[in-house]
Design a protein with these regions (language model features):
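Extracellular/periplasmic bilobal clamshell ligand-binding domains
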Residues: 306-343
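Short beta-strand->loop
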Residues: 28-31, 117-121, 133-136, 141, ...
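Mature extracytoplasmic/periplasmic domains
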Residues: 260-320
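Ligand-binding pocket segment of bilobal, Venus flytrap-like solute-binding proteins
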Residues: 163, 167-170, 174-248
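Ligand-binding clamshell of periplasmic/extracellular solute-binding protein-like
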Residues: 55-64, 72-95, 101-106, 126, ...
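Periplasmic solute-binding protein
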Residues: 85-93, 116-144, 172-173, 257-262
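A structural signal for short loop-to-beta-strand junctions that line the ligand-binding cleft
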Residues: 72-77, 95-131, 147, 158-159
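Early extracytoplasmic/lumenal segment of secretory-pathway proteins
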Residues: 22-87, 343
Length: 343
Protein backbone atom coordinates (compact mmCIF):
# COMPACT_ATOMS: atom_id res chain seq x y z
CA UNK A 1 0.00 0.00 0.00
CA UNK A 2 1.41 3.38 -0.96
CA UNK A 3 2.26 6.02 1.58
CA UNK A 4 -0.34 8.37 0.09
CA UNK A 5 -3.07 5.73 0.34
CA UNK A 6 -2.11 4.87 3.93
CA UNK A 7 -2.17 8.54 4.85
CA UNK A 8 -5.59 9.01 3.27
CA UNK A 9 -7.02 6.00 5.11
CA UNK A 10 -5.56 7.22 8.39
CA UNK A 11 -7.02 10.66 7.86
CA UNK A 12 -10.42 9.17 7.06
CA UNK A 13 -10.34 7.02 10.18
CA UNK A 14 -9.36 10.01 12.31
CA UNK A 15 -12.23 12.06 10.87
CA UNK A 16 -14.70 9.26 11.59
CA UNK A 17 -13.49 8.93 15.17
CA UNK A 18 -13.75 12.68 15.69
CA UNK A 19 -17.26 12.70 14.24
CA UNK A 20 -18.26 9.93 16.63
CA UNK A 21 -16.71 11.80 19.54
CA UNK A 22 -18.55 15.05 18.71
CA UNK A 23 -21.62 15.38 20.95
CA UNK A 24 -24.94 15.16 19.11
CA UNK A 25 -28.25 16.83 19.93
CA UNK A 26 -31.34 15.20 18.43
CA UNK A 27 -33.85 17.87 17.48
CA UNK A 28 -37.46 17.30 16.37
CA UNK A 29 -38.58 20.55 14.74
CA UNK A 30 -41.84 21.85 13.30
CA UNK A 31 -40.07 25.03 12.18
CA UNK A 32 -39.84 24.56 8.40
CA UNK A 33 -37.81 27.68 7.75
CA UNK A 34 -34.62 27.42 5.70
CA UNK A 35 -33.37 30.52 7.45
CA UNK A 36 -33.08 28.50 10.69
CA UNK A 37 -30.11 26.61 9.23
CA UNK A 38 -27.80 29.46 10.19
CA UNK A 39 -29.23 29.43 13.72
CA UNK A 40 -28.30 25.77 14.16
CA UNK A 41 -24.89 26.21 12.53
CA UNK A 42 -24.04 29.04 14.91
CA UNK A 43 -24.93 26.87 17.90
CA UNK A 44 -22.67 24.07 16.67
CA UNK A 45 -19.86 26.54 16.01
CA UNK A 46 -20.16 28.00 19.50
CA UNK A 47 -20.52 24.73 21.43
CA UNK A 48 -19.15 21.91 19.28
CA UNK A 49 -22.50 20.12 19.63
CA UNK A 50 -23.75 18.77 16.31
CA UNK A 51 -27.49 18.95 15.63
CA UNK A 52 -29.25 15.98 14.06
CA UNK A 53 -32.67 17.17 12.97
CA UNK A 54 -36.01 15.56 12.16
CA UNK A 55 -38.49 17.88 10.43
CA UNK A 56 -42.25 17.29 10.54
CA UNK A 57 -45.41 19.23 11.29
CA UNK A 58 -46.50 19.61 14.89
CA UNK A 59 -49.04 16.79 14.78
CA UNK A 60 -46.51 14.48 13.16
CA UNK A 61 -43.91 15.20 15.82
CA UNK A 62 -46.33 14.51 18.66
CA UNK A 63 -47.49 11.28 17.03
CA UNK A 64 -43.89 10.17 16.55
CA UNK A 65 -42.98 10.89 20.17
CA UNK A 66 -45.93 8.81 21.37
CA UNK A 67 -45.06 5.93 19.04
CA UNK A 68 -41.39 5.92 20.03
CA UNK A 69 -42.04 6.12 23.76
CA UNK A 70 -38.97 5.64 25.95
CA UNK A 71 -36.95 4.58 22.88
CA UNK A 72 -37.25 8.04 21.33
CA UNK A 73 -33.89 9.64 20.50
CA UNK A 74 -35.40 13.15 20.68
CA UNK A 75 -33.68 15.60 23.00
CA UNK A 76 -35.33 18.90 22.04
CA UNK A 77 -38.78 19.57 20.58
CA UNK A 78 -39.60 22.80 18.70
CA UNK A 79 -43.28 23.55 17.99
CA UNK A 80 -44.98 26.61 16.53
CA UNK A 81 -48.16 27.04 18.54
CA UNK A 82 -48.80 27.53 22.26
CA UNK A 83 -51.80 25.19 22.26
CA UNK A 84 -49.68 22.40 20.79
CA UNK A 85 -46.98 22.95 23.40
CA UNK A 86 -49.61 22.83 26.14
CA UNK A 87 -51.13 19.67 24.66
CA UNK A 88 -47.75 17.93 24.49
CA UNK A 89 -47.11 18.86 28.11
CA UNK A 90 -50.46 17.46 29.26
CA UNK A 91 -49.75 14.23 27.36
CA UNK A 92 -46.47 13.76 29.23
CA UNK A 93 -44.15 14.26 26.26
CA UNK A 94 -41.90 16.87 27.90
CA UNK A 95 -39.94 17.09 31.14
CA UNK A 96 -39.63 20.03 33.54
CA UNK A 97 -36.27 21.67 34.10
CA UNK A 98 -34.92 24.63 36.00
CA UNK A 99 -33.03 27.34 34.15
CA UNK A 100 -32.22 30.65 35.77
CA UNK A 101 -31.35 32.02 32.32
CA UNK A 102 -34.73 31.20 30.80
CA UNK A 103 -36.68 32.25 33.89
CA UNK A 104 -34.98 35.63 33.69
CA UNK A 105 -35.18 36.22 29.95
CA UNK A 106 -38.51 34.70 28.87
CA UNK A 107 -41.61 36.49 30.26
CA UNK A 108 -43.82 34.37 32.51
CA UNK A 109 -46.84 34.52 30.17
CA UNK A 110 -44.75 33.06 27.33
CA UNK A 111 -43.72 29.88 29.13
CA UNK A 112 -45.31 26.83 30.70
CA UNK A 113 -46.46 26.73 34.29
CA UNK A 114 -43.82 26.02 36.93
CA UNK A 115 -45.10 23.42 39.39
CA UNK A 116 -41.97 23.67 41.52
CA UNK A 117 -39.74 21.56 39.30
CA UNK A 118 -39.41 24.16 36.57
CA UNK A 119 -41.38 24.95 33.42
CA UNK A 120 -41.69 22.32 30.70
CA UNK A 121 -41.59 24.68 27.71
CA UNK A 122 -40.60 28.21 26.77
CA UNK A 123 -41.60 30.56 23.95
CA UNK A 124 -38.68 32.00 21.99
CA UNK A 125 -40.42 34.12 19.36
CA UNK A 126 -43.84 35.68 18.90
CA UNK A 127 -46.16 36.53 16.05
CA UNK A 128 -49.26 38.72 16.21
CA UNK A 129 -52.63 37.81 14.65
CA UNK A 130 -53.73 41.00 12.96
CA UNK A 131 -56.49 42.29 10.68
CA UNK A 132 -55.87 43.31 7.07
CA UNK A 133 -58.41 45.36 5.13
CA UNK A 134 -58.95 46.61 1.60
CA UNK A 135 -58.25 50.34 1.68
CA UNK A 136 -61.02 51.18 -0.80
CA UNK A 137 -63.73 49.06 0.84
CA UNK A 138 -63.18 49.26 4.60
CA UNK A 139 -62.31 51.95 7.12
CA UNK A 140 -59.69 51.00 9.74
CA UNK A 141 -62.01 52.15 12.52
CA UNK A 142 -64.47 49.43 11.50
CA UNK A 143 -61.93 46.67 12.25
CA UNK A 144 -59.86 48.02 15.13
CA UNK A 145 -61.01 45.26 17.49
CA UNK A 146 -61.63 41.55 17.06
CA UNK A 147 -65.17 42.12 18.30
CA UNK A 148 -65.95 44.49 15.40
CA UNK A 149 -65.22 41.75 12.87
CA UNK A 150 -68.59 40.29 13.88
CA UNK A 151 -70.51 43.59 13.49
CA UNK A 152 -73.32 43.74 10.93
CA UNK A 153 -71.50 46.58 9.13
CA UNK A 154 -68.91 44.00 8.01
CA UNK A 155 -71.41 41.51 6.57
CA UNK A 156 -70.11 39.82 3.41
CA UNK A 157 -66.58 41.16 3.86
CA UNK A 158 -64.65 38.64 5.98
CA UNK A 159 -62.29 35.97 4.67
CA UNK A 160 -60.36 33.52 6.86
CA UNK A 161 -58.67 30.18 6.69
CA UNK A 162 -60.36 27.21 8.40
CA UNK A 163 -61.71 27.94 11.86
CA UNK A 164 -60.11 24.70 13.06
CA UNK A 165 -56.62 25.69 11.97
CA UNK A 166 -54.34 26.04 15.03
CA UNK A 167 -53.69 29.74 14.33
CA UNK A 168 -57.41 30.48 14.51
CA UNK A 169 -58.08 28.06 17.36
CA UNK A 170 -55.48 29.93 19.40
CA UNK A 171 -56.97 33.32 18.55
CA UNK A 172 -60.46 32.08 19.42
CA UNK A 173 -59.12 30.55 22.63
CA UNK A 174 -57.71 33.92 23.64
CA UNK A 175 -60.94 35.75 22.77
CA UNK A 176 -62.86 33.18 24.84
CA UNK A 177 -60.58 33.92 27.78
CA UNK A 178 -61.22 37.66 27.43
CA UNK A 179 -64.98 37.63 26.71
CA UNK A 180 -66.14 34.44 28.39
CA UNK A 181 -67.63 31.43 26.55
CA UNK A 182 -71.14 32.79 25.97
CA UNK A 183 -70.07 36.08 24.39
CA UNK A 184 -67.26 34.36 22.51
CA UNK A 185 -69.67 31.92 20.87
CA UNK A 186 -71.98 34.75 19.83
CA UNK A 187 -68.94 36.51 18.37
CA UNK A 188 -67.96 33.40 16.38
CA UNK A 189 -71.51 33.23 15.01
CA UNK A 190 -71.09 36.83 13.91
CA UNK A 191 -67.90 35.93 12.07
CA UNK A 192 -69.72 33.15 10.21
CA UNK A 193 -72.53 35.56 9.32
CA UNK A 194 -70.02 38.03 7.87
CA UNK A 195 -68.10 35.61 5.63
CA UNK A 196 -67.52 36.69 2.03
CA UNK A 197 -66.89 33.04 1.13
CA UNK A 198 -66.32 29.70 2.83
CA UNK A 199 -63.05 29.53 4.79
CA UNK A 200 -60.16 28.24 2.68
CA UNK A 201 -56.45 28.65 1.98
CA UNK A 202 -53.68 29.93 4.20
CA UNK A 203 -52.88 33.34 5.63
CA UNK A 204 -51.15 34.60 2.47
CA UNK A 205 -54.25 33.62 0.49
CA UNK A 206 -56.38 35.81 2.77
CA UNK A 207 -54.04 38.77 2.26
CA UNK A 208 -54.17 38.42 -1.52
CA UNK A 209 -57.95 37.95 -1.49
CA UNK A 210 -58.31 41.22 0.41
CA UNK A 211 -56.02 43.01 -2.04
CA UNK A 212 -57.98 41.66 -5.03
CA UNK A 213 -61.29 42.84 -3.61
CA UNK A 214 -62.70 39.34 -3.20
CA UNK A 215 -62.86 40.15 0.52
CA UNK A 216 -62.83 43.38 2.44
CA UNK A 217 -61.26 41.97 5.60
CA UNK A 218 -58.86 39.15 6.47
CA UNK A 219 -56.96 37.77 9.46
CA UNK A 220 -53.28 36.85 9.28
CA UNK A 221 -50.13 36.28 11.28
CA UNK A 222 -47.68 39.15 10.97
CA UNK A 223 -44.75 37.21 9.54
CA UNK A 224 -46.77 36.49 6.39
CA UNK A 225 -47.19 40.24 5.95
CA UNK A 226 -43.50 40.87 6.60
CA UNK A 227 -42.53 38.36 3.91
CA UNK A 228 -44.63 40.21 1.35
CA UNK A 229 -43.29 43.55 2.55
CA UNK A 230 -39.69 42.38 2.08
CA UNK A 231 -40.38 40.66 -1.24
CA UNK A 232 -38.82 42.08 -4.41
CA UNK A 233 -41.75 40.75 -6.46
CA UNK A 234 -43.74 43.48 -8.20
CA UNK A 235 -46.93 41.48 -7.61
CA UNK A 236 -46.25 41.20 -3.87
CA UNK A 237 -45.53 44.92 -3.64
CA UNK A 238 -48.80 45.65 -5.43
CA UNK A 239 -50.67 43.51 -2.90
CA UNK A 240 -49.23 45.46 0.01
CA UNK A 241 -50.13 48.80 -1.59
CA UNK A 242 -53.82 47.85 -1.63
CA UNK A 243 -54.21 46.72 1.97
CA UNK A 244 -54.05 48.29 5.39
CA UNK A 245 -53.01 46.58 8.62
CA UNK A 246 -54.64 46.94 12.04
CA UNK A 247 -53.37 45.64 15.36
CA UNK A 248 -56.72 45.00 17.09
CA UNK A 249 -57.75 45.90 20.63
CA UNK A 250 -55.09 48.50 21.31
CA UNK A 251 -57.55 50.25 23.63
CA UNK A 252 -58.41 47.11 25.59
CA UNK A 253 -56.59 43.82 26.17
CA UNK A 254 -54.13 44.10 23.26
CA UNK A 255 -53.51 42.13 20.09
CA UNK A 256 -53.40 38.34 20.30
CA UNK A 257 -49.94 36.81 20.03
CA UNK A 258 -48.82 33.24 19.62
CA UNK A 259 -45.39 31.69 20.03
CA UNK A 260 -42.87 29.30 18.63
CA UNK A 261 -41.35 27.44 21.56
CA UNK A 262 -39.15 24.62 22.69
CA UNK A 263 -38.98 21.89 25.31
CA UNK A 264 -36.81 19.01 26.47
CA UNK A 265 -38.25 15.66 25.43
CA UNK A 266 -39.48 13.34 28.19
CA UNK A 267 -36.92 10.65 27.35
CA UNK A 268 -34.05 12.91 26.28
CA UNK A 269 -30.64 11.25 26.52
CA UNK A 270 -28.69 14.53 26.35
CA UNK A 271 -30.50 16.73 28.85
CA UNK A 272 -27.55 19.02 29.53
CA UNK A 273 -27.01 19.73 25.83
CA UNK A 274 -30.76 20.17 25.35
CA UNK A 275 -30.92 22.82 28.06
CA UNK A 276 -27.84 24.50 26.61
CA UNK A 277 -29.56 24.71 23.22
CA UNK A 278 -32.77 26.17 24.65
CA UNK A 279 -30.78 28.75 26.59
CA UNK A 280 -28.93 29.59 23.37
CA UNK A 281 -32.30 30.32 21.72
CA UNK A 282 -32.85 33.00 24.37
CA UNK A 283 -29.47 34.65 23.71
CA UNK A 284 -29.31 38.12 22.17
CA UNK A 285 -27.84 36.75 18.94
CA UNK A 286 -30.49 34.04 18.47
CA UNK A 287 -33.33 36.37 19.43
CA UNK A 288 -32.21 38.98 16.91
CA UNK A 289 -31.99 36.21 14.35
CA UNK A 290 -35.66 35.27 14.84
CA UNK A 291 -36.53 38.86 13.93
CA UNK A 292 -34.07 39.43 11.11
CA UNK A 293 -34.20 35.95 9.59
CA UNK A 294 -37.84 34.92 9.92
CA UNK A 295 -39.83 38.09 10.61
CA UNK A 296 -40.82 37.08 14.17
CA UNK A 297 -40.67 39.27 17.24
CA UNK A 298 -38.17 38.19 19.91
CA UNK A 299 -39.63 36.84 23.14
CA UNK A 300 -36.92 38.70 25.04
CA UNK A 301 -37.90 42.35 25.31
CA UNK A 302 -35.73 45.37 24.68
CA UNK A 303 -33.45 43.84 22.03
CA UNK A 304 -32.23 45.68 18.95
CA UNK A 305 -32.82 44.06 15.58
CA UNK A 306 -32.75 45.16 11.97
CA UNK A 307 -35.90 44.20 10.07
CA UNK A 308 -37.45 47.01 8.02
CA UNK A 309 -40.80 45.21 7.72
CA UNK A 310 -41.21 44.71 11.48
CA UNK A 311 -40.07 48.29 12.06
CA UNK A 312 -42.69 49.54 9.58
CA UNK A 313 -45.42 47.49 11.26
CA UNK A 314 -44.44 49.36 14.41
CA UNK A 315 -44.80 48.85 18.12
CA UNK A 316 -48.08 47.63 19.52
CA UNK A 317 -49.79 46.53 22.73
CA UNK A 318 -49.98 42.75 22.97
CA UNK A 319 -52.15 40.69 25.27
CA UNK A 320 -50.46 39.33 28.39
CA UNK A 321 -52.66 36.38 29.32
CA UNK A 322 -50.63 33.16 29.72
CA UNK A 323 -50.36 31.66 26.24
CA UNK A 324 -51.13 28.25 27.76
CA UNK A 325 -54.81 29.26 28.17
CA UNK A 326 -55.35 28.93 24.43
CA UNK A 327 -54.63 25.23 24.84
CA UNK A 328 -56.85 24.93 27.89
CA UNK A 329 -59.73 26.52 25.95
CA UNK A 330 -59.23 24.58 22.72
CA UNK A 331 -61.80 21.81 23.26
CA UNK A 332 -64.59 24.22 24.17
CA UNK A 333 -63.62 26.48 21.26
CA UNK A 334 -63.88 23.60 18.79
CA UNK A 335 -67.30 22.73 20.19
CA UNK A 336 -68.41 26.34 19.70
CA UNK A 337 -67.13 26.34 16.12
CA UNK A 338 -69.08 23.17 15.42
CA UNK A 339 -72.26 24.69 16.82
CA UNK A 340 -72.01 27.91 14.79
CA UNK A 341 -70.96 26.10 11.60
CA UNK A 342 -67.49 27.64 11.30
CA UNK A 343 -65.60 25.09 9.20
Amino acid sequence: MSFVRRAALAAGLLWALCAQAQPVLNLYSARHYQTDEALYANFTKATGIRIQRVDADDAGILARLKAEGSASPADVILLVDAARLWKAETEGLFQPFKSATLQKRIPAHLRGKDDGQGSQWFGFSTRARVVVYNKTAVQPGDVDSYEKLADARNKGKLCTRSGSHPYNLSLFGAVTEHLGPQKAEAWMQGLVNNMARAPKGGDTDQIKAVASGECGIGITNTYYLARLMRSKSVDDQAVMEKIGVVFPNQNSWGTHINIAGGAIAKHAKNVEAAQQFLEYLASDAAQAYFANGNNEWPAVSGLDFSNPALEKLGKFKSETIPVSVVGMNQVKVQQMLDRVGYR
